[in-house]
């Protein structure tokens, strides 16, 4: 899988950064693209990338603030003409996302040529699709804001060839049945496939956060994640200023990384008061501390393998 950032600024765009938008490419598990938040100008950012809107099957909105949703109506309209015709779309988000989209479409007299399935979250959500499991949990941002825990399908354990030979089953087409079915038959006897396979392995886990100040659900979402995408609107200065505005400080994110055993962290939603030079200087200062965990400040169009 691969995470690509189309917007990394907080609140307002800058000359170097667009507002929030993240794409998750599901290959090799699926050929679909999932988007997380659609800030203003997202569709224009996507034009500079190989990703096509027609491959976007799901959009997950973290919360209803403008820097996370103002690009949604335009992107949905353009999808009709960029390979999305008659291809269903699932839109997941807080209560109000359906009304926002439908009112935007109605008032602008825009007509979509594909169906949208809306899923509005209350407190939490568990959603299954193509072997993926997505959990949404409520954060602390003053308005309903959610973090998404995306779990890729399990990988079936390796076949125990010796065990199969011991029951007289030599390598051949039957092995595929052992790998892909719960049971198989050999010489008139039914066997449990799991007895002839190694343990299944959980696929990669990606945690993608909306805006939040520290809260207990953060650890639920990010536990043992392979990749965590988290906001740090404030990357220097007093921590209490970030929390007063229901945002996270870089120190909050570092604490979460250690508590939740996160392998790699990608930090986005940086305040527009920081320019590229500021961010680079702060990064160099932070990584000189041996206690600093593994992280990156991301910029627009950065991509990371999961």
UniProtKB/Swiss-Prot annotation:
Active site: 67
Keyword Chloroplast tagged: no
Alphabetically ordered keywords of this record: Endonuclease, Hydrolase, Metal-binding, Nuclease, tRNA processing, Zinc
Reaction it catalyzes: Endonucleolytic cleavage of RNA, removing extra 3' nucleotides from tRNA precursor, generating 3' termini of tRNAs. A 3'-hydroxy group is left at the tRNA terminus and a 5'-phosphoryl group is left at the trailer molecule
Binding site for Zn(2+) 2: 67-68, 211, 269
Amino-acid positions noted as binding Zn(2+) 1 in the UniProt annotation, renumbered to this chain: 63, 65, 141, 211
UniProt xrefs under SUPFAM superfamilies: Metallo-hydrolase/oxidoreductase
UniProt keyword Transit peptide present: no
Top-level lineage group: Bacteria
InterPro entries registered for this protein in UniProt: RibonucZ/Hydroxyglut_hydro, RNase_Z/BN, tRNase_Z_dom
Enzyme Commission number, as recorded: 3.1.26.11
A GO molecular function held by the record: 3'-tRNA processing endoribonuclease activity
Cofactor remark from the record: Binds 2 Zn(2+) ions.
Needed co-factor(s): Zn(2+)
Top EC class, one word: hydrolase
Function recorded in the entry: Zinc phosphodiesterase, which displays some tRNA 3'-processing endonuclease activity. Probably involved in tRNA maturation, by removing a 3'-trailer from precursor tRNA.
Recorded family membership: Belongs to the RNase Z family.
Oligomeric and partner information: Homodimer.
Name of the protein in question: Ribonuclease Z
Origin species: Staphylococcus aureus (strain MSSA476)
């Amino acid at each position: 899988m691969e995470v690509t950032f189309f917007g990394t600024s907080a609140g307002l765009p800058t000359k170097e950064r667009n507002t929030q938008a993240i794409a998750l490419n599901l290959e090799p598990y699926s050929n679909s693209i999932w988007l997380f938040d659609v800030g203003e100008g997202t569709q224009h950012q996507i034009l500079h990338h190989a990703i096509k809107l027609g491959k976007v099957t799901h959009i997950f909105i973290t919360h209803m603030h403008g820097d996370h949703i103002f690009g949604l109506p335009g992107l949905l309209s353009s999808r009709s003409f960029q390979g999305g015709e008659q291809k269903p779309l699932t839109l997941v988000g807080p209560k109000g996302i359906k009304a926002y989209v439908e009112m935007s479409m109605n008032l602008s007299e825009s007509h979509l040529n594909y169906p949208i399935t809306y899923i509005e979250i209350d407190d939490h959500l568990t959603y299954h699709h193509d072997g993926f499991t997505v959990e949404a949990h409520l954060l602390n941002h003053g308005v309903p804001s959610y973090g998404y825990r995306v779990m890729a399908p399990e990988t079936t354990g390796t076949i125990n060839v010796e065990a199969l030979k011991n029951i007289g089953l030599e390598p051949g087409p039957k092995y595929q049945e052992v790998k892909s079915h719960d049971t198989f038959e050999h010489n008139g006897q039914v066997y449990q496939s799991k007895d002839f396979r190694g343990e299944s392995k959980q696929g990669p886990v990606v945690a993608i956060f909306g805006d939040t100040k520290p809260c207990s659900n953060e650890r639920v979402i990010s536990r043992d994640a392979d990749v965590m995408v988290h906001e740090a609107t404030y990357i220097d200065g007093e921590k209490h200023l970030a929390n007063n505005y229901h945002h996270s400080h870089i120190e909050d994110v570092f604490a979460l990384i250690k508590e939740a055993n996160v392998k790699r962290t990608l930090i986005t939603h940086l305040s527009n008061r920081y320019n590229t030079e500021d961010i680079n200087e702060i990064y160099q200062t932070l990584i000189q501390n041996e206690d600093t965990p593994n992280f990156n400040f991301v910029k627009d169009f950065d991509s990371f393998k999961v």
